């Protein structure tokens, strides 16, 4: 018990806005599964963030449940990790509003993700999209997280979280722990198969560029065989000049555990066809047990329900302690 208390805490989550991608698995979930013994881990289905873009309600519910099943199938043991749905813990919305009042307009205006999402959703530039970083800060600060596993493109959100926490602490005394980003060196940023200069994303209009965790093996192989490479016909790791090949090498390296020098030697003198097939097959085999276990878990709705209810209870216990402290410091009258 003593050692558990001293563990550093981790908080992260993924939006259930669609099917989980290979990028989500290799860049995030796979790494999370290895952290439970060393850290006190909280992982959420970030459904509140998801509605900044219009969703089909029934699909959002389905994706949330599938994501929970995929988390577990990927090795996130509910006995070792707190797995919960963001909207099941009201403190997220409650602290989110308080932090809105301590977040400056200029800070939010500079966020690159707001600019990117606004450009993609010009007909729905809502306030939630703009204040997204304050809610994300609430997600992190509620749990007094030490570390936040994020992709390199989300480091800015952790930085603004630290700024908000520092501002609040400066006004009211130590309230929030300042989190640090945790960015894994390998598999941190998996790129699109068709546009390897862009991150693999479920919102990509060209679905051939995105591989899904629960996709059929034949579809995964087809996408890898069509993956963009170059005219050089040489398997060599060079992200600047050979982004497509380098992306495939990174995927193959993470899937097989082989380093880049070994991969280059393995495919020396061969064309890209055999290389792309090998990458596709390695991904199929990597994801096969996860897909099968996810399907098994989805057939046991009562078990999944017990997991997310227990997770919400554990998460709320920690979150409400932080929220009570915040409410007292800002001057809210206790109930």
Q: Can you say where each PLM-predicted feature lies in the sequence?
A:
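N-terminal Rossmann-like or analogous alpha/beta NTP/dinucleotide-binding catalytic cores
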Residues: 2-138, 282-285, 295
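Short, histidine-centered active-site or binding-site loop motifs used for metal coordination
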Residues: 14-16, 47-49, 146-147, 204, ...
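Short, polar/flexible loop-turn hinges at active-site or ligand-entry regions and domain interfaces
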Residues: 56-57, 148-151, 235
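A generic secondary-structure signal for well-formed alpha-helical elements
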Residues: 68, 75, 103-106, 145, ...
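Short catalytic-loop micro-motif centered on adjacent basic/acidic residues
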Residues: 82-85, 149, 232
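Short helix-capping/linker segments at secondary-structure and domain boundaries
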Residues: 105-109, 142-149, 253-263, 291
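Internal, conserved structured core segments that host functional sites
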Residues: 116-168, 172, 192
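Conserved nucleotide- and phosphate/pyrophosphate-binding catalytic cores
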Residues: 156, 162-335
């Amino acid at each position: 018990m003593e050692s558990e208390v001293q563990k550093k805490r981790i908080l992260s989550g993924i939006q259930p806005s669609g099917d989980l991608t290979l990028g989500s698995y290799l860049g995030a979930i796979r790494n999370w599964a290895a952290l439970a013994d060393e850290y006190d881990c909280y992982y959420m289905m970030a459904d509140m963030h998801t509605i900044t873009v219009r969703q089909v309600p029934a699909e959002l519910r389905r994706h949330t449940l599938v994501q929970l099943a995929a988390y577990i199938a990927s090795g996130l043991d509910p006995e070792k990790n707190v797995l919960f749905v963001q909207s099941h813990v009201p403190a997220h919305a409650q602290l989110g509003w308080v932090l809105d009042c301590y977040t400056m307009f200029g800070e939010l205006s500079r966020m690159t993700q707001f600019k990117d999402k606004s450009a993609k959703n010009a007909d729905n530039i809502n306030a939630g999209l703009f204040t997204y970083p304050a809610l994300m800060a609430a997600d992190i600060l509620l749990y007094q997280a030490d570390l936040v596993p994020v992709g390199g493109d989300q480091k800015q959100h952790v930085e603004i979280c630290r700024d908000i926490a520092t501002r609040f602490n400066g006004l009211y005394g130590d309230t929030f722990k300042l989190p640090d980003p945790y960015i894994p060196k390998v598999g941190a940023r998996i790129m699109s198969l068709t546009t390897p200069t862009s991150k693999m994303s479920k919102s990509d209009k060209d679905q051939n560029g995105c591989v899904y965790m629960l996709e059929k093996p034949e579809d995964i192989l087809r996408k890898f065989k069509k993956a963009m490479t170059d005219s050089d016909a040489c398997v060599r790791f060079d992200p600047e000049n050979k982004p497509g090949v380098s992306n495939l090498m990174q995927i193959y390296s993470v899937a097989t555990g082989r380093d880049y020098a070994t991969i280059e030697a393995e495919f020396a003198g061969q064309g890209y066809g055999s290389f792309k097939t090998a990458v596709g097959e390695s991904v199929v085999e990597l994801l096969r047990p996860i897909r099968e276990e996810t399907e098994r878990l989805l057939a046991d709705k009562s078990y999944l329900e017990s997991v997310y209810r227990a997770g919400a209870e554990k998460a709320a216990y920690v979150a409400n302690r932080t929220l009570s402290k915040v409410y007292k410091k800002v001057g809210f009258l206790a109930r």
